[in-house]
A protein has these predicted regions:
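Cytosolic, long alpha-helical scaffolding segments
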Residues: 1-245
Length: 245
């Protein structure tokens, strides 16, 4: 029986051909994601640099019990919050207007989560600064060698994970995440030393509590670095993996 449907060739209807042409034309006029991806990635990196600077500034305020420096860190946290809001809006716009799929979509979803983690790191840095501000009336904590070491290590891990993100380097991301154990070890040493100091003299209870809070916030920054490493693994492999079991 001969079909009443017009044909453009064996097994291919005119409707099929028209659908193919329409799909190809849409693909041709669709703006490339490359430019949007670069813009987003660059903005994420700038946000990451802000976070690293905040961690180091909070450290200086903590070491020197500098109330004014602490206040600057607390106030500057709004810059990180604004950056996260801008980036989240930009990513949502790109997803809505360009409808990315597969790896492009994973890239955007991963970066959206990275901005959230960076914003929380900024909050933790501001919390360290708040503890430093409360310590302003006490002598600088000379014995706490581990605390500056812990802060510098967390800042270095932030820098390292941003490098892994730039290169979309799964191996580098895993190596950075593995160093979170070093942060945890420093935290436990600070915890034990501080408790010993607090038991020895009740006058040390208040400053000791501030030190413990500051160390806790730094430890949380290390955990969030691991979360970003998991985002990079997801971006590369499409698999969700727990790097801090």
């Amino acid at each position: 029986m001969t079909s009443d449907e017009p044909s453009a060739g064996p097994g291919v209807t005119i409707q099929d051909q028209a659908s193919t042409v329409l799909a190809e034309s849409r693909q041709a006029v669709r703006p490339p994601l490359d430019r949007g991806e670069r813009e987003i990635k660059d903005a994420v990196l700038r946000m990451g640099v802000l976070v690293e600077d905040q961690i180091l500034a909070a450290l200086e305020a903590l070491i020197h019990h500098d109330a004014e420096a602490s206040l600057r860190v607390i106030q500057d946290d709004r810059r990180i919050n604004e950056a996260q809001f801008h980036l989240s809006s930009l990513i949502s716009t790109v997803i809505a207007t360009q409808q990315p799929v597969a790896r492009d979509l994973r890239f955007l979803l991963s970066l959206d989560h990275v901005t959230y983690e960076l914003e929380r790191m900024g909050d933790h840095a501001a919390s360290v600064a708040k503890q430093a501000r409360k310590l302003a009336g006490y002598p600088p904590p000379g014995p706490y060698v581990e605390l500056p070491e812990m802060a510098r290590l967390t800042a270095a891990l932030v820098r390292g994970i941003l490098g892994a993100l730039v290169d979309v380097d799964e191996v580098a991301a895993r190596k950075v995440a593995a160093r979170d154990d070093e942060v945890d070890q420093l935290y436990h040493r600070i915890f034990e030393k501080t408790l010993t100091m607090m038991r020895a003299d009740p006058a040390n209870v208040d400053p000791g509590t501030r030190i413990l809070f500051a160390a806790h916030y730094l430890e949380r920054i290390g955990d969030r670095v691991t979360n970003i490493a998991e985002d990079i693994v997801f971006l590369v492999t499409g698999e969700i993996e727990d790097l801090n079991p």
